[in-house]
Amino acid sequence: MTETGLILMWFPLIILGLFVLKWVLKRVNVWIYVSKLGEKKHYLPPGDLGWPVIGNMWSFLRAFKTSDPESFIQSYITRYGRTGIYKAHMFGYPCVLVTTPETCRRVLTDDDAFHIGWPKSTMKLIGRKSFVGISFEEHKRLRRLTSAPVNGPEALSVYIQFIEETVNTDLEKWSKMGEIEFLSHLRKLTFKVIMYIFLSSESEHVMDSLEREYTNLNYGVRAMGINLPGFAYHRALKARKKLVAAFQSIVTNRRNQRKQNISSNRKDMLDNLIDVKDENGRVLDDEEIIDLLLMYLNAGHESSGHLTMWATILMQEHPMILQKAKEEQERIVKKRAPGQKLTLKETREMVYLSQVIDETLRVITFSLTAFREAKSDVQMDGYIIPKGWKVLTWFRNVHLDPEIYPDPKKFDPSRWEGYTPKAGTFLPFGLGSHLCPGNDLAKLEISIFLHHFLLKYRVERSNPGCPVMFLPHNRPKDNCLARITRTMP
């Protein structure tokens, strides 16, 4: 038989073999996770569990790394219809993706049916004693302790002066530096604020070293948990070790100062964490304090820095919106007594600027998803979410739903005029008992920065068409290279 004849004979068999191999591989996760469910398997949401080990992560990463993040959920809608609930295999676990306001609201607010369910790989980075790793009762207790000093009206009134001074100093400095990475400097600014609130620290050296490690940590939070050199997760674990060591040194020093009755001028959050006792008189140990610090300092600067950048450049790209926001700030200043500083009352008069911030939160959707886990079999929309399965609330799909927000990709702050979103339709800070405890502080920081920026500065991007990266968070690939120019003395 000729060589051509052999090829023609074997070619169909090879193709058939590949199809059989694909069929087998695509059913491995089904055999592992679905077969044992018995009759309940017939009530699972539509979807597929992807490939062995990697599940659906390849299609997820491909969508988010090719600047088309909506294509991931759209592929489910195309194949299975607009059910708003789909089964998948993500971050090493069988899971259910929920993509509508109703399903997201149910998952985030029903604490009897769901509890926090971050992947184990992520828990190793965030800390098992942080808010995402502790019991529901312990979470409520620590949230009560930490929310008021971070987010309460009295605390916000105290922080305004420091935030305003920091913003003015940094903007003036940036305007003399020529081309800068706008995002990188904003993250340092917001990190400076959260360090002051939690640790009373204004040390540039300490802040720079910690902020660099947080950058590495965040790249690993939503990466595949592969602990091998060269992978983002491996670098993130190393960053966590360095952060823990730094915070351990800070906590130890603070405890020693207190033993020696060396007190600072103000009581910060670290003092509160050291002082707190439960009903049995138990205090927090160092691991608990360090994990809480690590979590709060990360959440307290990452979102604020990114969202401030996006609000600034989105307004710069829409001159009419920028002008309207600027005129509002000018009216506020005009009513102010000579020599008076910005007040909390004035920030609450920034109605249009608040709409700009809300629209930025919606369009950008800084938090991709929240992780929950079913405590028992949960019925939802005629389907069953099996006990132990992860549930991912897909915020991006809610915020870009044209039935809720017409022309959803258009940056249009006026859509918020006289509009109160229904529960579950606007989720930038989550919902329910795990609502972000620093949401008001974040909006205050953004408002103060934009107030002074609009009055005295403008930004000119070096690469306006720079591609956007979507993991771990939305950002221009060049970290928004730009020049900050002062427009008035």
From Swiss-Prot:
Function in brief: Catalyzes three successive oxidations of ent-kaurenoic acid giving gibberellin 12 (GA12), a key step in gibberellins (GAs) biosynthesis. GAs, which are involved many processes, including stem elongation, play a central role in plant development.
UniProt GO cellular component terms: endoplasmic reticulum; endoplasmic reticulum membrane
Signal peptide: none
Protein name: Ent-kaurenoic acid oxidase 2
Its membrane topology: Single-pass membrane protein
Species, as recorded: Arabidopsis thaliana
Cofactor(s) recorded in Swiss-Prot or TrEMBL: heme
Family note: Belongs to the cytochrome P450 family.
InterPro entries named among the record's database cross-references: Cyt_P450, Cyt_P450_B, Cyt_P450_CS, Cyt_P450_sf
Tissue-specific expression: Widely expressed. Highly expressed in influorescence stem, influorescence, and silique tissue. Weakly expressed in cauline and rosette leaves. Expressed at a weaker level in stem and influorescence than AtKAO1/CYP88A3.
Catalytic reaction(s) noted: ent-kaur-16-en-19-oate + 3 reduced [NADPH--hemoprotein reductase] + 3 O2 = gibberellin A12 + 3 oxidized [NADPH--hemoprotein reductase] + 4 H2O + 4 H(+); ent-kaur-16-en-19-oate + reduced [NADPH--hemoprotein reductase] + O2 = ent-7alpha-hydroxykaur-16-en-19-oate + oxidized [NADPH--hemoprotein reductase] + H2O + H(+); ent-7alpha-hydroxykaur-16-en-19-oate + reduced [NADPH--hemoprotein reductase] + O2 = gibberellin A12 aldehyde + oxidized [NADPH--hemoprotein reductase] + 2 H2O + H(+); gibberellin A12 aldehyde + reduced [NADPH--hemoprotein reductase] + O2 = gibberellin A12 + oxidized [NADPH--hemoprotein reductase] + H2O + 2 H(+)
Keyword Heme applies: yes
Annotated positions binding heme: 436
EC number, UniProt record: 1.14.14.107
Residues spanning the membrane: 5-25
